[in-house]
Amino acid sequence: MKSRLGKAEIIAMAVLTLALVATVVAGGCEKKEVSLAYDSSPEDLVVELRTSGGLPTPWVDGISEFKMYGDGRVIERPGGDERKPMVEGRLTPGEARALLENIRDTGFFRLKGEYANRKIMDGVTQRITVNLKEGKKEVRVYMKDVKEFATAAGFIMGYPLRDSSDYVPDKGYLLVQKSQEAPTDQPAPTEVIALLPPTADLLQAADNRKPIEISGESLVSIMKYESTQKYRGLVVKVDSGQVTVFPLYEPVVR
């Protein structure tokens, strides 16, 4: 004689079956590792760390703190110090692979796309982007403590870059503001002043509130001098008073 299962037994079996399926699926997901294969083209950006937002101060630069391209070329700001000029170097394929493995091992690829504390105003957003052959992973963090993200950012900015040299872009920018008398360092030497555009161009840039372009070589020389000074920007005397000049790789559009 066949026995009949009661309603309670059927429900219990269904729950057990679903639990077993969920366990198998979860186990499979945990075992699957992210493929770290990437395009080795020198134009392809593989890893990027970028900070944006914050109070609208004129010396905030829009350039990313770290970029690694497919051919191993790296452009970074040493130690993340915003006052230091950018440098560039190159990682071997093995070193690039090790960096990606470090990022993966932090749990970065399991993070959500965004973490934000909306209670804080005028904060900064940090973004890490990793472009691999199997897809792009981008995580943005706004004023929150996300351990995996912070660890990944630490690996990126702390990764040793051998034989680095000055990063010289094709062009740079100067943000010019009219200013009142203020504490300043010693006047810039004549060789630095000589790198600046004519006074009339500086005044026009200040009136238009638009950055003025200069050569990459001039930008780097100006930045190197400014980084040794106590105050941000170069104060330049003009007939109508003075202007403060802020050198930038990429002006921030607000």
Residue ranges and their predicted role:
Residues 61-79:
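Short, flexible N-terminal segments of the mature chain
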Residues 27-56, 110-254:
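Short, well-ordered, aromatic-rich surface patches in folded extracellular/luminal domains
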Residues 70-71, 93-96, 130-136:
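A short, structured loop/turn motif at beta-sheet edges
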Residues 14-23:
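Bacterial N-terminal signal peptides
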Residues 76-110:
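A short-motif feature that recognizes glycine-rich, charge-decorated loops
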Residues 60, 87-94, 120, 144, ...:
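Extracytoplasmic/periplasmic, Sec-exported soluble proteins
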Residues 2-15:
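Bacterial N-terminal signal peptides that target proteins for export
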Residues 64-66, 87-89, 135-141:
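Short beta-strand segments
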